[in-house]
């Protein structure tokens, strides 16, 4: 499990990560991962280097899914060539036995 967690965290650290809100930002910062919020992205405040991978990391609930869909649609229409990834965030949640981004730090920080 540790190796898979390390791999996922490495991927996230080397990409652009979008989360739902400020609490998620705080959790990811404690893990050394820089993020942008859903709100910032939807206001057009995200700059993505060409060819970068954008990880969409939302809670595993209806609202998180709706926000992930909105961000995916917005970024697909407004950015140049980039790769959107929603699966890595879900893998992280599953690996940490979490349903929200706020919950992932507990198993990782142990």
Identify the residue ranges that each predicted region occupies.
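Phosphate-handling DNA/RNA-contact segment within nucleic-acid enzymes
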Residues: 1-16, 22-26
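Helix N-cap/beta->alpha junction signal
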Residues: 21-22, 60
